[in-house]
Design a protein with these regions (language model features):
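Terminal substrate-recognition subdomain of acyl/acetyltransferases
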Residues: 15-22, 29-193, 197-207, 213-215, ...
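A residue-level signal for beta-strand positions that form part of recognition/binding surfaces
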Residues: 218
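Short, contiguous, well-structured surface segments enriched in hydrophobic/aromatic residues
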Residues: 221-223
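Conserved acetyl-CoA-binding loop-helix of GNAT-fold acetyltransferases
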Residues: 238-240, 244-257
Length: 377
């Protein structure tokens, strides 16, 4: 197994050198590159444990295509591509397995076309500053393994391919509505893989919580974020009044808890201030997550996370002064309706994973190389 990893790394490194030569030298032709790749492929055939190397190389090559997240001129994109390759080599076997997972699921492959950054989120800061690349990759792979099995196919596609799954409307005090939806992570996002969002009548996002299923038992919260801008504070106040006094971030936390319970997960973690991936010692970190998690009876775990109760103790109507009971009932009605909309969206029969068997054939690198060179020109 170790030999296979080493040989796979050497093959991809040799292939990357060819790719960089083509980028830097006008004298190198596509035909010459294809001949080089075929020679590598032919040289690897006699050894049985190398049989999957060229297929992995082909996947790796495809991961360099359609990279609209690599911006700038040709030189800058080539430099970003080179860094991507070198980072991949530090986690070669895991990264190649991830590429195989993506190409083995049509819905994931469609999401990769929409957001190519998903190919390398684990190679950058992600979810918590305390994780290494292997932990980031394991969490991301587990999330999509779980989401494909637990989310109805139509909902998964709406979220990750079309960009939003609209779950329904919540009635506000002034007669208006909030739209509850699910979204994929933002471009260059580092706080998680699934966004639960409320927005206004016009579709503008107001509040969101970003979550990730990081293992068989755990849902992790990477952020709870409200509106920004100069009038953000007043927007939150107005929204709280329209929710009969229910704070929007409490509604978002309730939805994260509801999702974890619906999916049968037993732990809810939330990242603290010090471990947040966007924390910068040279810049003030605006959100005070620690205070909010402690307010919500979170317990610090000692590794940058807070563990939150999945079933918090809630006040009953008897605990509320009589003059405030009407507003309390309305707040609870909004929360319960939001949780119902989320659960109803997830209630269809889970989609089972399909097993794909790969057959070793000599790959045709021509169309792939033409595509890459066309994008780089």
């Amino acid at each position: 197994m170790v030999c296979a990893d080493i040989e796979g790394g050497i093959s991809i490194f040799r292939f990357t050198n060819v790719l960089l030569l083509i980028d830097g030298s006008e004298a190198t032709t596509l035909d010459e590159m294809q001949q080089t790749l075929r020679a590598i492929w032919a040289a690897e055939q006699p050894v049985p444990w190398r049989s999957g190397t060229m297929e992995a190389m082909a996947r790796f090559l495809r991961s360099l295509r359609g990279r609209q997240d690599w911006r700038g001129n040709v030189g800058k994109r080539a430099w970003v591509a080179a860094k991507y390759v070198l980072r991949c080599l530090t986690l070669l076997r895991g990264h190649l397995d991830f590429l195989a997972q993506i190409e083995g699921e049509p819905a994931l492959l469609a999401f990769r076309r929409r957001d190519p950054r998903m190919l390398e989120r684990h190679l950058h800061r992600y979810l918590t500053r305390g994780w290494r690349r292997r932990q980031r990759l394991d969490a991301i792979r587990w999330h999509y393994h779980h989401a494909l099995a637990a989310m109805p196919a139509a909902v998964f596609r709406a979220v990750y391919v079309e960009g939003i799954a609209r779950l329904g409307l919540l009635m506000l005090k002034d007669g208006g509505h909030l739209e509850l939806g699910l979204r994929p992570p933002i471009v260059f996002g580092c706080e998680g893989e699934l966004c639960i969002q409320i927005g206004d009548d016009s579709g503008n996002p107001l509040y969101r919580v970003v979550v990730t299923v990081i293992d068989a038992d755990t849902l992790a919260i990477g952020c709870i974020q409200g509106p920004d801008g100069g009038d953000a504070r007043e927007t939150v106040r107005a929204l709280t009044r329209n929710l009969h006094g229910l704070r929007p971030r409490c509604l978002m936390l309730a939805l994260a808890r509801a999702l974890a319970r619906h999916w049968g997960l037993s732990r809810l973690l939330a990242v603290g201030n010090a471990a947040h991936p966007l924390r910068n010692p040279r810049r003030r970190f605006v959100a005070d997550y620690d205070a909010y998690w402690e307010e919500q009876h979170g317990r610090e775990t000692g590794d940058g996370w807070y563990e939150l109760p999945l079933h918090p103790q809630r006040k009953t109507e008897a605990d509320i002064p009589s003059q405030h009971r009407s507003a309390f009932r309305k707040r609870e009605a909004v929360r319960i309706e939001a949780e119902r909309l989320l659960s109803d969206a997830m209630n269809a029969m889970p989609r089972r994973h399909r097993q794909h068997e790969a057959h070793a054939v000599e790959p045709d690198f021509g169309p792939l190389l033409h595509g890459i060179c066309a994008e780089a020109s």
